[in-house]
């Protein structure tokens, strides 16, 4: 999968001279190639002799043989193509010098016509070249990284000196016609002078083979110096202790998301930070590719800043940007910066909570583990900090001894070190044989605070089969005790290709691609890695490679192969310890003094506080008013004031204080809502749950401090304890005359407008705590709800009912036809359902002899959200033995009327009266009772009953434009007609009796009317409030009905009940004749208060922002 970039990477302005670097590089590269071939082959030397001599004499230095000069020109050509400014300067200097020499020869005169032609042509070419180079100056913008120039120069001098001495000795042994006094200058010209001096300056010639040898000695010295310089560039620019310390701090703050984050501390990488210091990218430069390692480290909000800094770095030095192992989130960030993304493969993630050895998919692992255990293997798991130094040395020796390659591989997904004192949080998993000898081991690095990521896997050649499987399984099974919730295993390249190519019906391209991968797996173990991870049934997380454009994909690929260690270049220093000398941390971060030179993690709390002090909170962006209040809190604390002290009960509530006598000493606590300052006198309004009171702070009355102290310390919304005497202000307003006060809770966020409060309904739902603090209506509603719940309990308790609690997590969803919420228990590895009703468990209690029982609790249905529905709601279910559904008509009416009395002070329901007002409507007395069929008949204007056939009902539904499903029976169509034509249009509370049996699977058939169930629904103002049944107690009939429901569930009906065998077994012990009631308490509260369900619930479910 390839993700294309939405915009181009920001680059320099393209000018008409953009071709100059490439042209200059090609020109010099051609001369370098021909010079090399001429130094090797006499035939080539003979073929190009004439043009070579002309170029060498008039245009550019081109000796007959010189390996050293060929090497120099090759470096210069590569640098020119890479737009290196130093290469531009060297070439320009060479051309200017050549032009000067040509001009001098022309001015001197005395030349032949051929020489004049050559010198004039050469001078003209040089002038043109100088003009082009000068005009193309801005195209050579890239720099060269810092390196050990003096060390490289010393190597070059020493190598050149050795080459000169050896060459001098050779020319003394085989002088040819070279004069003795010219031998040392001649070899010096050939070894370190690149044969630039005219051969005519020397007397005689040695053998041409020696000329090649002299140039080779010079080339070897140059190559050695170049290698030293390039290696020093990487080593000098690698991580310093401060860099590593900063990275570790970022990992502790933000390292939970990326399993590869800890590998950013690999010390042969370089790093570049965002200017804020809150994000960084680690990278390595290979063959001109700046290869970033995975995602940026740090705050994702600062990733783009770090990526931009990295891209600018690439542009500065002329590197091609590339990324290895980016996650989906990281690839999106790189894509936003202008790169393309190509899916490389997938990372295998084990979630220990879901891991088990049981099941058919785990058969292979289970058998391998069994074999390993039979061989007597045990597993030991320890943190590196718990391993002694001597034992760690043995561990390192074992890791080196069992490695099947000369050097350690890895870059983006490997740490490259074992047993380092800075890695004490790493985890070591060891397999021990019966003699307690280690036969295999895994080392895993931290992944945030609760994960580990595989770094190293080793096993002895003598370890039994199944050793690795045993270690991985034991780690997953013991993970909870180790505080581990995620385990990152190996990375499988091109995983999707293996899966798609092996699928039935895979196309020829997919099969060919898979065959190629299998073929190359003989050397690179691509398929082996996939198979070794797949058997654990992990979660596969994609990883991506990023690149600038398609033409650099091969270059980025080769750089990745080199960086990962699959291709080891000569003189590679993969096993060397790299310690950089140039810290990359931003000055503002280094200036905090929190970073450590040894690379250990800084004080994270200090790092966070430092960011906050700079106005750059790593956790959140704070509004100005919040920052002002935080600063005030800081000042209070510095003054020794505890803004959040231990509580002391006030002597009075506000309501009690208002009723107290004048001069009575009272203490109240509450929230400050308004403040009026008149200099030495200050008025404030304080509110607690019982009411609001004016408090008066007068300098002459305060026992300690002044009113100005209150004004300076207190903001609107703060919680304050006031102590003083009751009295009145000069205007006669009843007030608390404050003697002393105490801040008991600093409010860090401003309250809404003090006059209007919260007016946005959505804001009131999301911040109910603020709504309750400022809105008296919200407090009235929550009080009314409490009164309704208390009244329901008291009414039922007075009738002899006992309250019970039944399971919310249930193995079978039943008790009602509704779509359930599904969850999962890891311990038993099975799905559970949040109950849609407590009915089946309450009936079990009825079987056990509990004759009057009720439960008032939460139920859950995965259905719509509107003014009368919330997925989580309060449900009352009550059962009375030796009763039927008609008994519950009076009891239900009494429950609701009592609840209205408790909430409103009278048996009334609040109804809209226009203009946003509510008016009470009486609900006392006896309520209407109708049968369902009679009510539907009234609405249709045509009589129907339980015997009306399905065709007639469908005709009536079509006439009334009521939709129905083809698979519905007559009862379901009647129910649909009832819901549309009767329920939605009902005003005063009405009981609708005798529903069709087919839509009441848990209800007893009517005692005298076939096809009718003894059930009623209570409806008021278009809302169903409750339902009651004469419960079905016949276990045989009950089984038949539930089996019908289970068939519907198996057929795909998500609302149909499942077959609860345990419930049916309980029913077979016989349940007495019982009447049952189910009532939606939330809807009763809505009826009584006249408000929607979202207003009456303290915390209704709100859609995420």
From Swiss-Prot:
Named cofactor requirement(s): Mg(2+)
Q: Which region ranges are annotated with the description Lysine--tRNA ligase?
A: 604-1105
Question: Could you say which residues bind Mg(2+) 2 here?
Answer: 1024
Q: Which InterPro entries match?
A: Aa-tRNA-synt_II (IPR004364), aa-tRNA-synth_II (IPR006195), aa-tRNA-synth_II/BPL/LPL (IPR045864), LPG_synthase_C (IPR024320), Lys-tRNA-ligase_II (IPR002313), Lys-tRNA-ligase_II_N (IPR044136), Lys-tRNA-synth_II_C (IPR018149), NA-bd_OB-fold (IPR012340)
Catalytic reactions on record: tRNA(Lys) + L-lysine + ATP = L-lysyl-tRNA(Lys) + AMP + diphosphate; L-lysyl-tRNA(Lys) + a 1,2-diacyl-sn-glycero-3-phospho-(1'-sn-glycerol) = a 1,2-diacyl-sn-glycero-3-phospho-1'-(3'-O-L-lysyl)-sn-glycerol + tRNA(Lys)
Task: Name the residues that bind Mg(2+) 1.
Answer: 1017, 1024
Query: What does the UniProt cofactor note say?
Result: Binds 3 Mg(2+) ions per subunit.
Give the membrane topology, semicolon-separated if more than one: Multi-pass membrane protein
Please list the GO biological process terms of this entry. lipid metabolic process; lysyl-tRNA aminoacylation; response to antibiotic
Keywords in alphabetical order, please.
Aminoacyl-tRNA synthetase, Antibiotic resistance, ATP-binding, Cell membrane, Ligase, Lipid metabolism, Magnesium, Membrane, Metal-binding, Multifunctional enzyme, Nucleotide-binding, Transferase, Transmembrane, Transmembrane helix, Virulence
> Cellular location of this protein?
Cell membrane
Enzyme Commission number(s) from the entry: 6.1.1.6, 2.3.2.3
Q: Which domain of life is it from?
A: Bacteria
Transmembrane residue ranges? 20-40, 62-82, 86-106, 117-137, 154-174, 186-203, 208-228
Record Pfam families: LPG_synthase_C, tRNA-synt_2, tRNA-synt_2_TM, tRNA_anti-codon
GO cellular component assignments? cytosol; plasma membrane
User: Its function?
Assistant: Catalyzes the production of L-lysyl-tRNA(Lys)transfer and the transfer of a lysyl group from L-lysyl-tRNA(Lys) to membrane-bound phosphatidylglycerol (PG), which produces lysylphosphatidylglycerol (LPG), one of the components of the bacterial membrane with a positive net charge. LPG synthesis contributes to the resistance to cationic antimicrobial peptides (CAMPs) and likely protects M.tuberculosis against the CAMPs produced by competiting microorganisms (bacteriocins).
Family, as annotated: In the N-terminal section; belongs to the LPG synthetase family.
UniProt protein name: Lysylphosphatidylglycerol biosynthesis bifunctional protein LysX
- The species is Mycobacterium ulcerans (strain Agy99)
Q: What is the lineage of its organism?
A: Bacteria, Bacillati, Actinomycetota, Actinomycetes, Mycobacteriales
């Amino acid at each position: 999968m390839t993700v294309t970039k939405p915009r181009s990477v920001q680059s320099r302005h393209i000018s008409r001279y953009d071709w100059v670097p490439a042209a200059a590089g090609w020109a010099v590269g051609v001369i370098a190639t021909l010079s090399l071939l001429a130094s090797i082959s006499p035939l080539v030397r003979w073929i190009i002799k004439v043009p070579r001599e002309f170029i060498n004499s008039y245009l550019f230095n081109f000796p007959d043989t010189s390996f050293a000069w060929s090497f120099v020109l090759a470096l210069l050509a590569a640098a020119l193509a890479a737009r290196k400014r130093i290469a531009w300067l060297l070439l320009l200097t060479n051309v200017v010098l050549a032009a000067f020499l040509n001009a001098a020869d022309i001015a001197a005169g005395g030349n032949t016509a051929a020489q004049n032609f050559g010198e004039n042509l050469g001078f003209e070419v040089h002038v043109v070249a100088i003009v082009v180079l000068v005009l193309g100056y801005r195209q050579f913008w890239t720099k060269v990284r810092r390196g050990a120039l003096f060390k490289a120069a010393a190597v070059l001098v020493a190598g050149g000196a050795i080459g000169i001495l050896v060459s001098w000795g050779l020319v003394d042994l085989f002088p040819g016609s070279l004069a003795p006094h010219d031998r040392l200058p001649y070899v010096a010209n050939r070894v370190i002078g690149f044969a630039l001096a005219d051969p005519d300056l020397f007397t005689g010639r040695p053998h041409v083979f020696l000329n090649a040898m002299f140039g080779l000695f010079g080339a070897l010295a140059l190559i050695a110096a170049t290698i030293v310089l390039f290696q020093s560039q990487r080593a000098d620019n690698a991580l310093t202790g401060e860099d590593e310390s900063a990275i570790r701090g970022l990992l502790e703050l933000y390292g939970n998301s990326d399993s590869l984050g800890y590998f950013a501390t690999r010390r042969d990488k370089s790093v570049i930070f965002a200017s804020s210091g809150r994000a960084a990218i680690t990278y390595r430069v290979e063959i001109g590719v700046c290869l970033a390692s995975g995602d940026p480290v740090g705050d994702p909000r600062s990733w783009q800043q770090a990526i931009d800094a990295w891209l600018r770095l690439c542009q500065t030095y002329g590197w091609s940007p590339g990324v290895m192992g980016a996650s989906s989130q990281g690839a999106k960030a790189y894509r936003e910066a202008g790169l393309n993304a190509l899916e490389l493969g997938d990372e295998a993630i084990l979630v220990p909570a879901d891991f088990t050895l049981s099941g058919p998919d785990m058969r292979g692992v289970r058998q391998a583990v069994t074999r390993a255990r039979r061989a007597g293997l045990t597993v030991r798991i320890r943190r590196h900090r718990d391993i002694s130094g001597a034992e760690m040395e043995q561990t390192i020796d074992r890791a080196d001894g069992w490695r099947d390659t000369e050097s350690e591989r890895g870059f983006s997904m490997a740490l490259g070190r074992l047993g380092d004192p800075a890695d004490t949080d790493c985890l070591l998993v060891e397999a021990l044989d019966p003699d307690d000898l280690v036969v295999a081991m895994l080392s895993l690095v931290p992944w945030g605070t609760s994960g580990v990521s595989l770094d190293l896997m080793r096993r002895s050649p003598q370890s039994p089969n199944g050793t690795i499987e045993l270690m991985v399984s034991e780690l997953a099974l013991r993970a909870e005790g180790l505080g581990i919730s995620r385990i990152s295993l190996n990375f499988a390249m091109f995983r999707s290709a293996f899966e798609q190519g092996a699928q039935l019906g895979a196309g020829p391209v997919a099969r060919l691609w898979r065959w190629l991968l299998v073929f190359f797996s003989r050397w690179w173990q691509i398929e082996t890695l996939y198979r070794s991870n797949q058997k654990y049934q992990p979660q596969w997380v994609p990883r991506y490679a990023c690149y600038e454009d398609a033409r650099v994909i091969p270059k980025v690929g080769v750089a990745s192969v080199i960086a990962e260690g699959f291709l080891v270049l000569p003189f590679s220093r993969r096993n060397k310890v790299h310690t950089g000398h140039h810290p990359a941390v931003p000055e503002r971060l280094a200036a905090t003094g929190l970073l450590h030179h040894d690379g250990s993690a800084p004080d994270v709390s200090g790092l966070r506080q430092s960011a906050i002090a700079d106005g750059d909170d790593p956790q959140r962006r704070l509004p100005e008013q919040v920052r002002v209040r935080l600063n005030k809190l800081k000042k209070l604390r510095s003054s020794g004031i505890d803004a959040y002290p231990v509580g002391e009960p006030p002597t009075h509530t506000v309501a009690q204080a208002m009723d107290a006598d004048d001069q009575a000493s009272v203490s109240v606590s509450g929230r400050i809502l308004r403040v009026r300052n008149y200099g030495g006198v200050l008025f404030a309004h304080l509110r607690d749950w019982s009411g609001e009171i004016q408090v008066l702070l007068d300098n002459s009355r305060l026992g300690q401090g002044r009113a100005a102290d209150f004004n300076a310390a207190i903001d609107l919304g703060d919680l304050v304890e006031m102590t003083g005497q009751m009295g009145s202000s000069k205007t006669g307003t009843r007030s608390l005359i404050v003697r002393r006060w105490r801040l008991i809770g600093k409010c860090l966020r401003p309250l809404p407008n003090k006059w209007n409060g919260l007016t946005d309904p959505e804001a009131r739902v999301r911040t109910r705590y603020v709504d309750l603090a400022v809105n008296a209506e919200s407090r009235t509603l929550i009080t009314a709800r409490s009164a309704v719940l208390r009244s329901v309990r008291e009414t039922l308790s007075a009738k002899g009912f006992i309250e019970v609690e039944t399971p919310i997590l249930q193995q079978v969803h039943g008790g009602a036809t509704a779509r359930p919420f599904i969850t999962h228990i890891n311990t038993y590895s099975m799905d559970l359902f949040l109950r849609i009703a407590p009915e089946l468990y309450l009936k079990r209690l009825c079987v056990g002899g509990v004759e009057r029982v009720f439960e008032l609790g939460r139920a859950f249905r995965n259905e719509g959200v509107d003014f009368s529905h919330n997925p989580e709601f309060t449900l009352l279910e009550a059962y009375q033995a030796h009763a039927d559904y008609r008994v519950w008509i009076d009891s239900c009416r009494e429950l609701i009327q009592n609840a209205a009395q408790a909430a409103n002070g009278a048996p009334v329901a609040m109804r809209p009266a226009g203009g946003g007002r509510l008016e009470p409507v009486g609900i006392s007395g006896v309520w209407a009772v109708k049968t369902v069929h009679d009510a539907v008949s009234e609405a249709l204007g045509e009589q129907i009953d339980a015997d009306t056939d399905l065709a007639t009902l469908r005709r009536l539904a079509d006439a009334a434009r009521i939709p129905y499903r083809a698979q519905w029976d007559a009862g379901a169509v009647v129910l649909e007609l009832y819901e549309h034509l009767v329920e939605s249009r009902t005003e005063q509370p009405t009981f609708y009796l005798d529903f069709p049996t087919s839509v009441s699977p848990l209800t007893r058939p009517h005692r005298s009317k076939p096809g009718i169930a003894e059930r009623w629904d209570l409806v008021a103002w278009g809302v169903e409030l409750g339902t009651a049944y004469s419960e079905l107690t016949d276990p045989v009939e009950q089984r038949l009905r539930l089996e019908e429901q289970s068939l519907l569930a198996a057929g795909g009906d998500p609302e149909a009940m499942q077959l609860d065998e345990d419930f049916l077994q309980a029913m077979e012990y016989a349940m007495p004749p019982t009447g049952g009631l189910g009532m939606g308490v939330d809807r009763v509260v809505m009826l009584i208060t006249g408000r929607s369900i979202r207003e009456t619930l303290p915390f209704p479910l709100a859609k995420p922002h």
